[in-house]
């Protein structure tokens, strides 16, 4: 893939040899069924969708509102010769149809947002008028059937993306929802997902060395735990994994916990 070393996030991809968000990489490589559709919402450079295409042979829909980053995703798809199985939608997923302002973070290339408060003191970047719509509208021609993974990273607009799913927020439609929720959206997002029939898991707080050791065990076929059930009394900050309650993935994660002791 193309890497711009002037970008903080892409520089991280370069120096870690692509090992960016390793727990999410494990979800993609080990939990997404082979050939299942993947939606990478808030794609940035497209790294997660590209991993899904490479390791799971997944057809991928990339959603990226920033014009420069959307073009980067297109080039990365073309560099791999995957134009026939991947598409890029240059728009923002939301809960309503219309136009919006995308605020560019001048310092952090992964923190552009529809929320000016999210960008905060780094509001020195440009502003773009962009198209926004619920995901079912943006992907209206997506073949009906299960989506193996919906990854949402909308920089403070994640709850609106969830709300905009409508009938798509269904365990029969979505196999995995991977989303970052912050502030009051944690409580609202949890309630929305649980009402729809999903159960949540949060990332274990691990030091990098310990995380790498557990990943080596998992990729070697040994049991280890990267994600723990979200307790009823609290909702973690940051990235969370949601799967159909009582489904195969939930049982698999529970079995890993049991075997790992």
Question: What is each of the regions a protein language model found here?
Answer:
Residues 1-261:
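Phosphate/nucleotide-binding beta-alpha loop and adjacent structural elements of enzyme active sites
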């Amino acid at each position: 893939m193309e890497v711009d070393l002037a970008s903080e996030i892409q520089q991280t991809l370069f120096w870690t040899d692509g090992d960016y968000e390793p727990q999410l990489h494990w979800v993609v490589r080990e939990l997404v069924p082979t050939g299942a559709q993947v939606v990478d919402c808030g794609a940035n450079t497209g790294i997660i969708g590209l991993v899904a295409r490479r390791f799971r042979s997944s057809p991928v829909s990339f959603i990226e509102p920033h014009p420069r980053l959307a073009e980067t995703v297109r080039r990365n798809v073309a560099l791999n010769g995957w134009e026939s199985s991947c598409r890029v939608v240059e728009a923002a997923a939301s809960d309503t149809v219309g136009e919006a302002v995308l605020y560019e973070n001048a310092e952090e290339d992964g923190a552009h947002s529809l929320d000016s408060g999210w960008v905060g003191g780094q509001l020195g970047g440009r502003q773009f008028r962009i198209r926004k719509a619920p995901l079912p509208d943006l992907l209206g021609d997506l073949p009906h059937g299960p989506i193996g993974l919906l990854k949402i990273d909308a920089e403070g607009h994640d709850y609106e993306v969830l709300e905009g799913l409508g009938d798509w927020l269904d365990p029969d439609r979505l196999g995995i929802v991977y989303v970052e929720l912050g502030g009051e959206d944690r409580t609202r997002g949890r309630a929305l997902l649980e009402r729809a029939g999903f159960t949540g898991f949060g990332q274990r707080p691990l030091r990098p060395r310990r995380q790498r050791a557990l990943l080596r065990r998992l990729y070697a076929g040994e049991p280890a735990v990267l994600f723990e059930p979200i307790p009823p009394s609290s909702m973690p900050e940051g990235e969370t994994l949601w799967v159909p309650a009582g489904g195969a993935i939930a049982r698999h994660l529970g079995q890993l916990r049991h075997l790992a002791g």
